[in-house]
């Protein structure tokens, strides 16, 4: 008797037809890998990404930070809460626009970021070794393109041109 064509083994081997599902599944898997690695320093992968972005942009407004992370403001607020609670970041009033809040990395936040950065480097090297350096570089480039506003615009135009 032939095995059913949709056994879990065959599903695992077959490529995803839906690019959205494939990207989300890969993102969840990578998120699990990074979460497991960051567990020793008490952060989640999303929290590490936030700390890095805050450090890069340097006291961004909530809106600017959300745009950099391609997140909505409510999701950003939810993700920031434990970092604020733990004293790693603080919200400060924008001097130019008192209605806006800026996200500031505290001294403890900088210390935690450096601790986590060492773990991040180890995971990055592990990924490059497991995936192959050239493949990893190409994947990063492709994902950066997909995450860009230009690609989003292009997709919208193409979507509306298909009848």
Where are these regions (language model features)?
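N-terminal leader segment of winged-helix/HTH proteins
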Residues: 1-41
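The alpha-helix within a helix-turn-helix
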Residues: 66
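Central "turn" residue of the DNA-binding helix-turn-helix
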Residues: 58-59, 70
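Residues that mark the N-terminal boundary/hinge immediately upstream of a DNA-recognition element
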Residues: 44-46, 61, 106
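Charged, amphipathic alpha-helical coiled-coil/dimerization segments
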Residues: 31, 59, 81-141
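Helix-turn-helix DNA-binding motif, specifically the short coil turn and the N-cap/start of the second
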Residues: 72-75
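C-terminal regulatory/oligomerization modules of transcriptional regulators
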Residues: 1-11, 133-163
């Amino acid at each position: 008797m032939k095995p059913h064509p949709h056994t879990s083994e065959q599903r695992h081997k077959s490529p995803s037809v839906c690019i959205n599902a494939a990207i989300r599944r890969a993102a969840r898997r990578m998120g699990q890998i990074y979460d497991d690695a960051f567990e020793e320093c008490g952060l989640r992968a999303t929290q590490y990404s936030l700390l890095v972005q805050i450090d890069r942009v340097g006291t961004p407004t909530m809106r600017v930070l959300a745009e950099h992370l391609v997140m909505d403001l409510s999701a950003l607020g939810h993700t920031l809460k434990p970092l604020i609670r733990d004293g790693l970041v603080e919200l400060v009033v924008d001097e130019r626009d008192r209605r806006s809040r800026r996200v500031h990395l505290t001294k403890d936040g900088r210390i935690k970021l450096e601790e986590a950065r060492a773990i991040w480097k180890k995971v990055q090297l592990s990924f490059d070794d497991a995936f192959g350096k050239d493949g990893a570089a190409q994947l990063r480039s492709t994902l950066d393109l997909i995450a860009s506003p230009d690609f989003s615009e292009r997709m919208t135009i193409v979507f509306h041109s298909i009848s």
